[in-house]
């Protein structure tokens, strides 16, 4: 299961982040890949320093303020936030992200797109699933969140430049099926409240959600 989050960062913040990133230096992205993934990874990453620290802080705050992200991911921690850049000819072949990022279990991965989709060709995030491949290329400021266990790749960029922020989430709820149940209950409770306000039925849904989270959460 994956989710498309719209407007995680508004256009003004996207411009600010792009300015910050544009002033920084980049290093070979292979330095942060595992032994197997390194063989298929050809991109660049913003070097360590104050700029990438600022980007990490702003993106973390933006995600944690986005109701859809919080509901879907149930985040406990965000780790290893990186800024990646793909220029003409660069790509990242099929791979699986590490189970542990920064010593923490990684349940979900995210990609926050910062380049306008019409400013580059190629560069789609390609997810491998039971029904085949799904290509994802979002507006600047939008993000996609998906299972870290999924095989995925970044298609070769054939024109322009693709800049994105990527990172990993340890969820309060380890199992994806349980996270999906809680996410569905969030949607139901929001719809009930919008339609009828506070009712007995809404209270029962909220009680059920809270009790399930109490059973499943790893705090």
Swiss-Prot record:
Binding residues for Fe cation: 95, 97, 152
Source organism of the structure: Maricaulis maris (strain MCS10)
InterPro entries: Oxoglu/Fe-dep_dioxygenase_dom (IPR005123), PKHD_C (IPR041097), PKHD_hydroxylase (IPR023550), Pro_4_hyd_alph (IPR006620), Pro_4_hyd_alph_FE2OG_OXY (IPR044862)
Keywords, alphabetical: Dioxygenase, Iron, Metal-binding, Oxidoreductase, Vitamin C
Any one of the GO BP annotations: intracellular iron ion homeostasis
Entry EC number(s): 1.14.11.-
Top-level EC class as recorded in UniProt: oxidoreductase
Name of the protein described by the UniProt record: PKHD-type hydroxylase Mmar10_1675
Record Pfam families: 2OG-FeII_Oxy_3, PKHD_C
């Amino acid at each position: 299961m994956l989710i498309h989050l719209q407007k995680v960062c508004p256009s003004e913040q996207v411009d600010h982040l792009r300015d910050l990133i544009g002033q920084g230096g980049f290093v070979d992205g292979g330095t942060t890949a595992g032994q197997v993934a390194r063989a298929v990874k050809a991109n660049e990453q913003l070097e360590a320093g104050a700029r990438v620290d600022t980007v990490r802080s702003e993106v973390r705050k933006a995600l944690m303020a986005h109701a859809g992200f919080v509901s879907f991911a149930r985040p406990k921690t965000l780790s290893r936030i990186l800024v990646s850049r793909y220029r003409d000819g660069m790509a990242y072949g099929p791979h699986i992200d590490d189970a542990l990022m920064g010593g923490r279990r990684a349940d979900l991965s995210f990609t926050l797109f910062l380049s306008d989709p019409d400013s580059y060709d190629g560069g789609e995030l390609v997810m491998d699933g039971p029904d085949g491949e799904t290509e994802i290329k979002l507006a600047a400021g939008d993000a996609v969140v998906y299972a870290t266990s999924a095989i995925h790749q970044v298609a070769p960029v054939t024109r322009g430049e693709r800049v994105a922020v990527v990172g990993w989430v340890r969820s309060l709820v380890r199992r994806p099926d349980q996270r999906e149940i809680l996410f569905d209950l969030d949607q139901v409770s929001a719809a009930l409240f919008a339609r009828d306000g506070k009712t007995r039925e809404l209270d029962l849904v909220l009680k059920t959600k809270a009790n399930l989270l109490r059973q499943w959460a790893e705090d």
